[in-house]
Amino acid sequence: MSITPAKKSELISEYKVKDGDTGSAYVQCAILSERIRNLTEHLKIHKKDFHCRRGLMVLVCKRRKGLQYVRNKYGNDAYLDLVKRLGIRDVFH
């Protein structure tokens, strides 16, 4: 359900804005998206794992707030680009 350090560093290198960037909104949204994908796969197998389902909802809300931050701070084009790169739905349009 968690992501491996190798996968995390791969996501950081793919979504970083500059060298040494590990905590920008882009990177955080990418890491949250990967964790959400892992939990979704887990819940397909374990349908009655309600504690995990609640954790998934918390992560989805955190990612939505991060995407909203990107949209407000960097503009709609940067937001749409990030959504496209992550392969998720646009939640604000």
Curated annotation (Swiss-Prot):
Presence of the UniProt keyword rRNA-binding in the record: yes
A GO molecular function assigned to this protein is:
rRNA binding
> A Gene Ontology biological process annotation?
translation
Q: Keywords assigned by UniProt? A: Ribonucleoprotein, Ribosomal protein, RNA-binding, rRNA-binding
Q: Which GO terms describe its cellular component?
A: cytosolic small ribosomal subunit
Residue ranges annotated as coiled coil are: none
Query: Any stretches that span the bilayer, and where are they?
Result: none
Which PANTHER family does the UniProt record give?
Answer: RIBOSOMAL PROTEIN S15, BACTERIAL AND ORGANELLAR, SMALL RIBOSOMAL SUBUNIT PROTEIN US15M
Function of the molecule:
One of the primary rRNA binding proteins, it binds directly to 16S rRNA where it helps nucleate assembly of the platform of the 30S subunit by binding and bridging several RNA helices of the 16S rRNA.
Which family does the record assign?
Belongs to the universal ribosomal protein uS15 family.
Quaternary structure, per UniProt, is:
Part of the 30S ribosomal subunit. Forms a bridge to the 50S subunit in the 70S ribosome, contacting the 23S rRNA.
Name by which UniProt lists this protein: Small ribosomal subunit protein uS15
- Species this chain originates from: Anaplasma marginale (strain St. Maries)
